[in-house]
Amino acid sequence: NATGWRDGSRAVRGLLKAEGIWVKGAHIIDGSGLSYRNRLTARTLTETLTLIATDPELRSIRNALPTAGQSGTMRNRFLQSPASCARGQVVAKTGSLPPTVSTLAGFTTSPNAPSRAFAVLVNDRPAAQAWSATSAAIDAVAAAAHGCSR
């Protein structure tokens, strides 16, 4: 019901704001993220991920994310160079709204460096560009955040 979604949206925005997370420009229409009218910035996502990584009560969310090249929706990602150097070192949530939106948000992990939160959002992907090319480009950006270089 629309009233329930509105109340839920206000509650989520209020919680984010109370934690000091940037919510300017955030539009949460439904709780699933499947509405084309939902809007979040990379900053909002990255700050939320940072909270997840630092709050012991939320850490289980991070631990549930699939690993690049190994599990879940990330099983077939980060397999080709230049992103392959981050295989097994990135945990993230994929997202897409066909035909033009593709996203990846999560963490880089390394035994030798602190974890880094990242969010890559692609809107208005050219219709002629294949999903695989978009995914490869997003993976390369996340790999660069991990510290991989070309």
Regions found by a protein language model. Name each.
Residues 127-138:
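Short, charged, low-complexity patches
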Residues 79-112:
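Short, Gly/Ser/Thr-enriched beta-strand-loop segments that form substrate-interacting elements
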Residues 61-72, 137:
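Active/binding-pocket-proximal capping segment
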Residues 42, 71-76:
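Large, well-folded core regions of big proteins
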Residues 1-59:
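A small/polar active-site loop signature that marks catalytic segments
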Residues 29-31, 64-69, 94-95, 108, ...:
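Active-site-proximal beta-strand/loop segments in catalytic clefts of secreted hydrolases
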Residues 36-61, 103-104, 109-123, 137:
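Active-site-proximal alpha-helical segments within enzyme catalytic domains
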